[in-house]
Amino acid sequence: MSILIIEAFYGGSHKQLVDLLQEELGDCVVYTLPAKKWHWRARTSALYFSQTIPISEHYRTLFASSVLNLTELAALRPDLGKLKKILYFHENQLIYPVKKCQERDFQYGYNQILSCLVADVVVFNSVFNMESFLTSMGKFMKLIPDHRPKDLESIIRPKCQVIYFPIRFPDVSRFMPKHKTTHLKKMLGLKGNGGAVLSMALPFQPEQRDSEDLLKNFNSECDTHCGLDTARQEYLGNSLRQESDLKKSTSSDNSSSHHGENKQNLTVDPCDILGGVDNQQRLLHIVWPHRWEHDKDPESFFKVLMHLKDLGLNFHVSVLGETFTDVPDIFSEAKKALGSSVLHWGYLPSKDDYFQVLCMADVVISTAKHEFFGVAMLEAVYCGCYPLCPKDLVYPEIFPAEYLYSTPEQLSKRLQNFCKRPDIIRKHLYKGEIAPFSWAALHGKFRSLLTTEPREDL
C-alpha cells in the first residue's frame, strides 16, 4: 500500500477517479469523507484525516484532490508531509461563480494556492483548469488589503501539468438502439485494460454531411428521406424494447434499498409514451446529466425548454445527475411545468440504468457556468448523444466548434430545429475525439505519476 489516496469529497467525479485508481493500480490505501457540505470539507478535513490515518512506513506517494487543505495536513502530520505529494484539481476556486461575494469565499481559493506551494506535483484535469487557476492568482491575491505575496505563479507553474480525467468507458452495445450502431463501431474496440478500448481516431462517413447544412436545407431534402420508414420502424421497435428493459430492471432494483429511489425517477411509463408515437418520427429526447446545483445553471436550461413548449414543439427530457443537501427550487417547478415531456427525473444509482438512458437519448445539453472537464458530457457523447455546450469554459478544448453555442438564444434555435427534424442528429456521427479521455489512453501517465521512485529522504 505505497500509494495513499485521500479524498475529502467522495462523490461524483471525485469518487469516480478514486475508485478507478484503486481498482486499476492496486497498491493503494484510501481514506475518504462523504460528499456532503463541501465548504466544511474544505475547512476541516485536514484535521480529521490527520487523526484518522495511521502512521505507516509503507507510504511513498500521497494523492489528494484540491478540496483537502494539503498545507494543514502536512503540518499536522510531518510523516505524511515527507511523502511525494500530488495534488489533483477537479476544479479551482479562483473563478468559482458565487451568488454573493463574501469575505469567507477568499479562504477556499487561498487554501488551494497554499496547497500548491506544499505539493510536489500539481495536476489539472484540463488546460483550461490549469491556465484559469494560474493566471487568476495575481488578481485574486489583490483582494488582500496589503503586504501581498509575490511571484506565486512563477513558483507554482513549474510544478503543474495536465492529465485529463480518465474515463473508463463501459461496453454499452446492449443498450444501443439500432440507429446508433454505426456510431458504436466507430467508437469501440473489442477489449483491453479491463474495459472498452476506443479508436484513437473517430472518423465519420465521407457521405455524412455537416448537420448544420442539413438543418439549413432540410425542407428541400424531405423527399430524400422517404425511404427511411422501415429503418425508423426498426429503430422504434428496438427503442421500445430498450425502454421496457429499463422499466423491468428498475422494478427489479426496487427490492434493494440501494436502488430504492429508481422507481420515482421513471416519472411515466416509457412504453406508454413511445407506444403512441407516430412511426414516422420519434420525439427528440434531450438529456441533462449534471449536478443539481446553481453553478450548472439549471435555470437557463429549463427556460429554454419552456420556450420550446411555448412554441408548440414536442420533446422528451431526462434530467439526471446527483443531488446534494440544497436543491435549487427550479427543479420542482420545472418538473411540474414540463409534465408529460419528462421521461426520467433524478439520480440513477445503477450505472447500467444511467448509461441506458444516455444511449436512448438524442441530445445532451450543458448550460454550466462552472466546468473544468465535464465527465457526464463525454459519457453521453460516447453513448451517441449530440452535444450542445457553451462556447466557454473547458468546452472549446474538448468539443469541435459545431457543438458550441454562444447564447441561450442560439441553444434554443438549435433545439427548435432538432425538435422539428430529430432524424438529422440521429444519423450524425460525432466529429471530435473521445479516445484521449479514456483510461486506456491515460493509464500510463497515472501509473508513472503515482508509482515513481520514493524520495531519498524517506
From Swiss-Prot:
User: What is the superkingdom listed in this entry's lineage?
Assistant: Eukaryota
Check the record and name the InterPro entries matching this protein.
Answer: Glyco_trans_1, GT-like_domain_containing_1, QTMAN_N
An annotated Gene Ontology molecular function: tRNA-queuosine(34) beta-mannosyltransferase activity
Basic and acidic residues bias: start-end ranges: 242-262
UniProt keywords (A-Z) are: Cytoplasm, Glycosyltransferase, Nucleus, Transferase
**Which Gene Ontology BP annotations are present?**
regulation of translation; tRNA modification
The record's listing under CDD domains reads: Glycosyltransferase_GTB-type
Instruction: Show the segment(s) annotated as Disordered.
Output: 242-267
Provide the protein's localization.
Answer: Cytoplasm; Nucleus
**Its biological purpose:** Glycosyltransferase that specifically catalyzes mannosylation of cytoplasmic tRNA(Asp) modified with queuosine at position 34 (queuosine(34)). Mannosylates the cyclopentene moiety of queuosine(34) in tRNA(Asp) to form mannosyl-queuosine(34). Mannosylation of queuosine(34) in tRNA(Asp) is required to slow-down elongation at cognate codons, GAC and GAU, thereby regulating protein translation.
- Similarity remark: Belongs to the glycosyltransferase group 1 family. Glycosyltransferase 4 subfamily.
Protein known as: tRNA-queuosine alpha-mannosyltransferase
The gene that this protein is the product of is: GTDC1
